[in-house]
Every structure is written in C-alpha cells, then in structure tokens.
A protein has these predicted regions:
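Acidic active-site catalytic centers that drive phospho-/nucleotidyl reactions
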Residues: 48, 97, 195
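Acidic, proline/glycine-enriched N-terminal capping motif
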Residues: 1-88, 93, 377
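Well-ordered mid-protein domain cores that form the structural environment of catalytic cofactors
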Residues: 73-127
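Conserved, structured C-terminal
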Residues: 1-21, 25-29, 103-377
C-alpha cells in the first residue's frame, strides 16, 4: 500500500490504518467515527486527502481542450473559480468525478480520485493536443480538507486576518512562510470548509501547526469512516461505488453537472440518446431504514414493498449519526424510484423496511452562498 506524507503522523495519533484505493489511510482515530462526524457538523475536522490525484493543465487552448473531455462547462468559470463534473467514456459512463480549479487565468488544477490517478492521467494524456501542457504533481503535493462551520475561523487564524476568504467553490493561491498553498472552498462533507494543496515536503509541519491552531476552535483529525458518513448524509457519490464506467451521470441524478448544450465532449452523444429515449432506465435513489436493524452496506439486495420483486442493489450505506438511522443509496428501475415509496433491504438474510427519501438527507445551515457560474443551466 502507498503511504501519504502524513502516514507516520496518523500512526502517532493512534489512527487505525486501512487500505483504500491502494493507499494506507486512517479510517478513524481513538476519538471514534461518531465524535469525528459530530466535530465536522458542529465545529471542525481535518482530513488527510493527500492520496487524491493532482494534475496541472495549462498552455494556449488548455481550457478549450479540457472542455472536450469534461462534462460541465469551463466557459462558465474564470480565474479563482472551480467546477465539479465528470470524465466520461463514449458510452456516457463515468471514468471519474473531479473538481477542476482555474487557479490562474488559463491554468487549471484537476483533483481526481486516488484509485483513478494512473487511469485518468493516461486517458487525458491520450487525448492531449499540441500546445497543452499536462503534468501529474500528485507525489509532490499533499492535501488537507479542513471542514466544518468553524473552518473559516481556522483559515483566518492560520493564514492571517488580512487574507481574504475564498468564495464558495473559489480557489486562492496563497503564500505562508515561503510555501505556496492552493486553498479552495470545497469539500466532501456538506459543510463549509476548505481544501488545502501544498508541497508534500511541508506536510508534517503544516499538519501539526494546523492541529495546534485549530484546537481552540474544536478541530480534531478525522478518518475515512467519518468522511463516508458525512458525504452519505448529503448524498455525494463515491466513485467506484455509486459511480462507475457502466453508469451515467443521468442515472446518478447528477445531470446538473453535465452541459449538453456544449458542442462536443466525450460521452455527449450517448447522453443525448438517453434523454431522447425518455431518460435513464434506472435511477440512483436515497433511502432511510424505518425499522431497527443493522445499517445497510453496499451490494445488499433491494426488494419491492411486498418483498416479491428484486429491484436492484445498494451502492452505499451506513449509519447516519445525524438521523440516528441507517441510510444508503441504490440503483432502482425509474418506475420504482419514487420519493416516499416503501422498499425492503436484505440485511444479512433479514428483510428490513426502508423508504425512498428526497436527496439530500441533511442540509447545513452554515454554507456561504453558491455562485451561479458553477452550475450548468
């Protein structure tokens, strides 16, 4: 397993290390998943996300080139802004979901999923056109996600009161003690927060300083367990589980991040055919358990309310600390994917009652306003 530059720091803090996407990562610290989850919802938590891939694209035509491969529309953003979207195969299936940050005019940072770094880079490189530079800086840069309602105070305490907070989905390039930081107001928790990208050589120093400065704001280190329960409450998809090359963004209910008005991008024609046929045959639904039973996990069978028909299977699942109930995501036939419809989940041989709910399960009251430009109309 690969190790992030903070591996030794996690072990020192008592992090329980597990394999994830080929990386050794902390699933939790001695504080426990529940405490870590609640810290992010009420104060702040910091996650090591150095396992994620970081590519830089630039040069004349970089934006136009990226727009032929990216489902969203980069023409809608400018320097200091970002956009979420997908790399799609020609069938419209998801190769990866990612955020593209325009950190300077015509210069882009692509942050991709850890297990997809090599595949994504090869795919992008295979489509690269003359004049566009593409580089993989994943091994040279670390990344931390500081998430929670007190994240802005921590940002100010760390970088200085004179440094302006980036807007939501914004990105700023900052200097601190001679070290460059790319700081974006993005995250995977549904709370306000920031993702910091900086040279890996400084990872240990930044981590310990951040924990020291953040302590008075209630900041604690958090692992993958809390990251998963937090993202599940806001129905953010996990690539490889809820998203795959066999599933389109339209099936996943993420058509907002696909701009079919663009002249061309990989997968567009296939998605137009899906729309012309009346929409996807299956849809990703959110469900909540309505009786006391173990929490749902991925690959559990989903049945109709009467238990007679197998409708599909779960892609994600777990316990929601906020709802104090099991929640999950599942692909079901479009006709069965109705909010309020009762279903059954087969949990270890027992049929448990659940109901399809409107996404998301949780909405933070602490989010800054969303800029209009980041969403394709």
């Amino acid at each position: 397993l690969k190790e992030t530059p903070l591996h030794a720091a996690h072990v020192r803090l008592g992090g329980k290390m597990v394999g994830f996407g080929g990386w050794s990562m902390p699933v939790q610290y001695p504080s426990g998943i529940l405490a870590e989850h609640r810290a992010v919802r009420t104060a702040a938590g910091v996650f090591d996300i150095s396992h994620m891939g970081q590519f830089v694209a630039g040069g004349p035509g970089a934006q136009a080139w990226l727009n032929t491969l990216f489902s969203n529309n980069l023409d809608r953003i400018g320097p200091g802004e970002s956009q979420y979207g997908f790399l799609l195969n020609e069938a419209g299936g998801v190769i990866d979901d990612l955020i593209i940050y325009e950190y300077a005019a015509g210069e882009f940072l692509l942050v991709v999923n850890a297990s997809k770094i090599a595949e994504d880079y090869a795919w992008l490189e295979g489509h690269r056109v003359p004049g566009v530079q593409l580089s993989d800086r994943s091994d040279r840069f670390a990344a931390l996600a500081v998430q929670g309602p007190r994240a802005p105070e921590i940002f100010t305490a760390f970088f200085g009161a004179e440094v302006i907070l980036p807007a939501r989905f914004g990105v700023s390039v900052l200097q601190r003690d001679g070290l460059p930081f790319f700081v974006a107001r993005t995250g995977y928790t549904g709370e306000d927060g920031f993702e910091w990208f900086f040279p890996a050589r400084a990872a240990e120093v930044v981590w310990s300083e951040l924990l020291d400065i953040g302590a008075r704001f209630g900041l604690i280190p958090c692992g993958l367990g809390a990251r998963d329960s937090l993202r599940l409450e806001v129905c953010y998809p996990l690539n490889g589980s809820d998203l795959s090359p066999e599933r389109t963004p339209l099936e996943a209910g993420l058509g907002t991040f696909v701009d079919l008005k663009k002249e061309h991008f990989s997968g567009r024609d296939a998605l137009l055919q899906v729309k012309a046929a009346g929409g996807p045959a299956e849809k990703l639904v959110a469900f909540r358990m309505t009786e006391k039973c173990p929490p749902p996990r991925p690959h559990y069978a989903v049945f109709s309310a009467d238990g007679a028909t197998r409708l599909g299977e779960t892609t994600s699942g777990g316990l929601s600390p906020t709802l104090a109930a099991g929640i999950g995501l599942a692909y079901l036939p479009a006709a069965a994917a109705r909010v309020g419809a009762p279903i059954q989940i087969d949990i270890r041989g027992r049929r448990c009652q659940a109901v399809i709910e409107k996404k998301p399960f949780y909405k933070s009251a602490n989010l800054p306003p969303k800029p209009v430009a980041t969403v394709a109309i």
